[in-house]
Each structure stands twice: as structure tokens, then as C-alpha cells.
């Protein structure tokens, strides 16, 4: 029974896939922004799978993956993030410097065996 329950719990977990369109001349600023999230996200209750920067090819697209046990935990994380001084400072940094031109979020679930 526990194997079935674990697969059901895993199926309910979500991963937020974030696609960023960047100003290609401000990639270094985005990298600073992303590095800050590596500490802020876990502090606020999320699992930061990672951030990915352009290396070859397209120079203005970056990605992030964040995981949560479920949507309720994601919503709790968002509330904690809004109350976190470092998180708000990082949002303000992005807004002030305008290195993110567009952001898309997709909520994914893992396919269970």
C-alpha cells in the first residue's frame, strides 16, 4: 500500500517551469537575480531545482524549475515570499533594472509509473 500512496503523492507534487525572456544585454543582472533566488526560495519553502542561463544559441531565454508538494504549498510559499525582505528586494531589483522582458509560468506534474 505504501508504494501506491507514494506514487499518488508524487503525482500530486507540482513543478513550476518558468521561462524568462531577457534583455540580452543585461544577462549578468539576471544571473545575479537567479543566484539570489537559490537561497531565498528554499528559505520560503520551495525546492529550487535550478536556474538555467543561455550558453550557446538563443541569447535571451532563461529557465527555472521550482518544486512543491502541491498547489496549497505553492500558495503558502508565495505568501511567505511576499513577506520576505530579501525576496522583495530581489523582485524590486528586477523591476528597477528591467532585465526580464517577459515571464511565463507553467505548472507541471510528474508522470507516475
Describe these PLM feature segments:
Residues 2-22:
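N-terminal beta-strand motif that seeds the catalytic metal site of vicinal oxygen chelate
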Residues 57-60:
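Short acidic/glycine-enriched loop/turn segments that link adjacent beta-strands
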Residues 14-19, 30, 41, 64-65:
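Short, structured motif recognition centered on aromatic/hydrophobic residues
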Residues 22-32:
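Short, surface-exposed ligand-recognition loops at beta-strand->loop->(often short) alpha-helix junctions
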Residues 19-24, 66-70:
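Short beta-strand-to-loop capping motifs
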